[in-house]
Protein backbone atom coordinates (compact mmCIF):
# COMPACT_ATOMS: atom_id res chain seq x y z
CA UNK A 1 0.00 0.00 0.00
CA UNK A 2 2.78 2.42 0.92
CA UNK A 3 4.53 1.75 -2.40
CA UNK A 4 1.33 2.59 -4.27
CA UNK A 5 1.11 5.90 -2.40
CA UNK A 6 4.74 6.61 -3.29
CA UNK A 7 4.07 5.93 -6.97
CA UNK A 8 0.96 8.12 -7.06
CA UNK A 9 2.70 10.94 -5.18
CA UNK A 10 5.74 10.83 -7.47
CA UNK A 11 3.51 10.79 -10.54
CA UNK A 12 1.76 13.97 -9.45
CA UNK A 13 5.06 15.63 -8.58
CA UNK A 14 5.98 14.87 -12.19
CA UNK A 15 2.80 16.66 -13.29
CA UNK A 16 4.33 19.90 -11.99
CA UNK A 17 5.35 21.24 -15.42
CA UNK A 18 8.07 23.84 -14.99
CA UNK A 19 8.02 24.81 -18.66
CA UNK A 20 4.27 25.39 -18.60
CA UNK A 21 4.54 27.57 -15.47
CA UNK A 22 7.57 29.50 -16.77
CA UNK A 23 5.79 30.11 -20.09
CA UNK A 24 2.70 31.43 -18.34
CA UNK A 25 4.58 33.61 -15.85
CA UNK A 26 7.14 35.12 -18.23
CA UNK A 27 5.20 35.47 -21.48
CA UNK A 28 1.63 34.34 -20.75
CA UNK A 29 1.87 31.51 -23.27
CA UNK A 30 1.30 27.77 -23.23
CA UNK A 31 4.75 26.57 -24.29
CA UNK A 32 3.13 23.48 -25.82
CA UNK A 33 1.54 25.71 -28.46
CA UNK A 34 4.85 27.21 -29.58
CA UNK A 35 8.04 26.00 -31.19
CA UNK A 36 8.23 22.21 -31.25
CA UNK A 37 5.21 21.93 -28.94
CA UNK A 38 7.26 20.06 -26.36
CA UNK A 39 7.00 21.02 -22.69
CA UNK A 40 10.73 20.92 -22.05
CA UNK A 41 13.92 22.94 -21.65
CA UNK A 42 15.03 22.88 -25.29
CA UNK A 43 11.74 24.26 -26.58
CA UNK A 44 11.77 26.89 -23.83
CA UNK A 45 15.34 27.83 -24.83
CA UNK A 46 14.37 28.30 -28.46
CA UNK A 47 11.13 30.10 -27.65
CA UNK A 48 11.77 32.11 -24.48
CA UNK A 49 15.55 32.26 -24.09
CA UNK A 50 18.35 31.10 -21.82
CA UNK A 51 17.03 32.28 -18.43
CA UNK A 52 13.63 30.69 -18.90
CA UNK A 53 15.27 27.48 -20.13
CA UNK A 54 17.62 27.39 -17.13
CA UNK A 55 14.66 27.77 -14.75
CA UNK A 56 12.82 25.01 -16.58
CA UNK A 57 15.77 22.64 -16.49
CA UNK A 58 16.37 23.34 -12.80
CA UNK A 59 12.73 22.82 -11.85
CA UNK A 60 12.40 19.60 -13.82
CA UNK A 61 15.67 18.27 -12.40
CA UNK A 62 14.69 19.11 -8.83
CA UNK A 63 11.39 17.27 -9.01
CA UNK A 64 13.23 14.13 -10.09
CA UNK A 65 15.74 14.50 -7.28
CA UNK A 66 13.03 15.19 -4.71
CA UNK A 67 10.89 12.21 -5.68
CA UNK A 68 13.73 9.70 -5.51
CA UNK A 69 15.26 11.17 -2.35
CA UNK A 70 12.05 11.30 -0.32
CA UNK A 71 11.05 7.76 -1.26
CA UNK A 72 14.54 6.45 -0.48
CA UNK A 73 14.78 8.36 2.80
CA UNK A 74 11.39 7.52 4.24
CA UNK A 75 10.34 4.24 2.58
CA UNK A 76 13.24 2.37 1.01
CA UNK A 77 15.32 1.55 -2.06
CA UNK A 78 12.65 -0.31 -4.01
CA UNK A 79 10.12 2.46 -3.42
CA UNK A 80 12.69 5.00 -4.59
CA UNK A 81 13.22 3.14 -7.86
CA UNK A 82 9.47 3.06 -8.45
CA UNK A 83 9.20 6.75 -7.55
CA UNK A 84 11.97 7.57 -10.01
CA UNK A 85 10.08 5.93 -12.85
CA UNK A 86 6.73 7.38 -11.74
CA UNK A 87 7.94 10.99 -11.62
CA UNK A 88 9.26 10.72 -15.18
CA UNK A 89 5.97 9.19 -16.34
CA UNK A 90 4.19 12.08 -14.62
CA UNK A 91 6.40 14.57 -16.44
CA UNK A 92 6.01 12.91 -19.84
CA UNK A 93 2.29 12.13 -19.58
CA UNK A 94 0.76 14.53 -17.02
CA UNK A 95 -2.95 13.95 -16.42
CA UNK A 96 -3.29 17.56 -15.23
CA UNK A 97 -2.15 18.82 -18.64
CA UNK A 98 -4.06 16.40 -20.82
CA UNK A 99 -1.17 13.89 -20.94
CA UNK A 100 0.87 16.29 -23.07
CA UNK A 101 4.20 16.76 -21.29
CA UNK A 102 7.90 16.80 -21.98
CA UNK A 103 10.50 14.21 -22.87
CA UNK A 104 11.75 13.61 -19.35
CA UNK A 105 15.47 14.23 -19.78
CA UNK A 106 15.97 16.80 -17.01
CA UNK A 107 13.70 14.85 -14.66
CA UNK A 108 15.58 11.62 -15.42
CA UNK A 109 18.85 13.43 -14.73
CA UNK A 110 17.47 14.52 -11.37
CA UNK A 111 16.44 10.98 -10.51
CA UNK A 112 19.82 9.60 -11.60
CA UNK A 113 21.77 12.20 -9.61
CA UNK A 114 20.26 10.83 -6.40
CA UNK A 115 20.16 7.16 -7.45
CA UNK A 116 23.80 7.17 -8.54
CA UNK A 117 25.71 10.46 -8.83
CA UNK A 118 28.61 8.76 -10.63
CA UNK A 119 26.38 7.10 -13.24
CA UNK A 120 24.51 10.37 -13.75
CA UNK A 121 27.67 12.44 -14.15
CA UNK A 122 29.21 9.89 -16.52
CA UNK A 123 26.07 9.87 -18.70
CA UNK A 124 25.76 13.67 -18.63
CA UNK A 125 29.44 14.06 -19.53
CA UNK A 126 29.05 11.84 -22.57
CA UNK A 127 25.95 13.78 -23.57
CA UNK A 128 27.83 17.07 -23.28
CA UNK A 129 30.62 15.74 -25.50
CA UNK A 130 28.07 14.71 -28.14
CA UNK A 131 26.34 18.09 -27.89
CA UNK A 132 29.64 19.95 -28.28
CA UNK A 133 30.63 17.82 -31.26
CA UNK A 134 27.36 17.62 -33.19
CA UNK A 135 25.21 20.50 -31.78
CA UNK A 136 22.07 18.35 -31.56
CA UNK A 137 20.37 18.41 -28.14
CA UNK A 138 18.25 15.41 -29.09
CA UNK A 139 21.26 13.29 -30.08
CA UNK A 140 23.01 14.32 -26.88
CA UNK A 141 19.98 13.34 -24.78
CA UNK A 142 19.44 10.03 -26.57
CA UNK A 143 23.11 9.11 -26.16
CA UNK A 144 23.15 9.94 -22.45
CA UNK A 145 19.93 8.01 -21.79
CA UNK A 146 21.07 5.00 -23.84
CA UNK A 147 24.27 4.61 -21.83
CA UNK A 148 22.72 5.29 -18.40
CA UNK A 149 21.49 1.70 -17.72
CA UNK A 150 24.96 0.32 -18.34
CA UNK A 151 26.52 2.73 -15.83
CA UNK A 152 23.84 1.67 -13.33
CA UNK A 153 24.51 -2.04 -13.88
CA UNK A 154 27.31 -2.01 -11.29
CA UNK A 155 24.61 -1.45 -8.64
CA UNK A 156 22.85 -4.67 -9.60
CA UNK A 157 20.24 -6.02 -11.99
CA UNK A 158 17.42 -4.06 -10.31
CA UNK A 159 19.19 -0.79 -11.04
CA UNK A 160 19.96 -1.86 -14.59
CA UNK A 161 16.26 -2.59 -15.24
CA UNK A 162 15.36 0.72 -13.59
CA UNK A 163 17.78 2.54 -15.90
CA UNK A 164 16.53 0.59 -18.90
CA UNK A 165 12.93 1.67 -18.26
CA UNK A 166 14.04 5.31 -18.01
CA UNK A 167 16.10 4.91 -21.18
CA UNK A 168 13.26 3.35 -23.18
CA UNK A 169 10.87 6.13 -22.15
CA UNK A 170 13.37 8.81 -23.16
CA UNK A 171 14.09 7.22 -26.54
CA UNK A 172 10.37 6.72 -27.20
CA UNK A 173 9.68 10.39 -26.46
CA UNK A 174 12.43 11.30 -28.95
CA UNK A 175 11.05 9.16 -31.77
CA UNK A 176 10.20 12.19 -33.95
CA UNK A 177 13.66 13.65 -33.30
CA UNK A 178 15.20 10.37 -34.39
CA UNK A 179 13.26 10.54 -37.67
CA UNK A 180 14.50 14.10 -38.25
CA UNK A 181 18.08 13.15 -37.39
CA UNK A 182 17.89 10.43 -40.02
CA UNK A 183 16.56 12.82 -42.67
CA UNK A 184 18.89 15.67 -41.71
CA UNK A 185 16.06 18.02 -40.73
CA UNK A 186 16.65 18.14 -36.97
CA UNK A 187 17.39 21.63 -35.62
CA UNK A 188 20.76 22.29 -34.05
CA UNK A 189 21.12 24.13 -30.76
CA UNK A 190 21.03 27.90 -31.04
CA UNK A 191 18.24 28.16 -33.58
CA UNK A 192 15.54 30.29 -31.98
CA UNK A 193 11.80 30.12 -32.57
CA UNK A 194 9.69 33.28 -32.49
CA UNK A 195 6.75 33.42 -30.07
Curated annotation (Swiss-Prot):
Pathway: Lipid metabolism; phospholipid metabolism. It catalyses: an acyl phosphate + sn-glycerol 3-phosphate = a 1-acyl-sn-glycero-3-phosphate + phosphate. The keyword Transmembrane applies. It is found in: Cell membrane. It holds the Pfam family G3P_acyltransf. The chain crosses the membrane at residues 2-22, 79-99, 111-131, 146-166. Keywords: Cell membrane, Lipid biosynthesis, Lipid metabolism, Membrane, Phospholipid biosynthesis, Phospholipid metabolism, Transferase, Transmembrane, Transmembrane helix. Probably interacts with PlsX. This is Glycerol-3-phosphate acyltransferase. It comes from Alkaliphilus metalliredigens (strain QYMF).
Amino acid sequence: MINLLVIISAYFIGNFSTSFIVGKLTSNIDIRQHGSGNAGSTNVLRTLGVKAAALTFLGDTLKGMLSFYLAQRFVGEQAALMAGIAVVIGHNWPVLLGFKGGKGIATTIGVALIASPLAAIASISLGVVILYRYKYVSLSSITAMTILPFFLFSYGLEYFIFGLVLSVMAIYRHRENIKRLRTGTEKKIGRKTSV
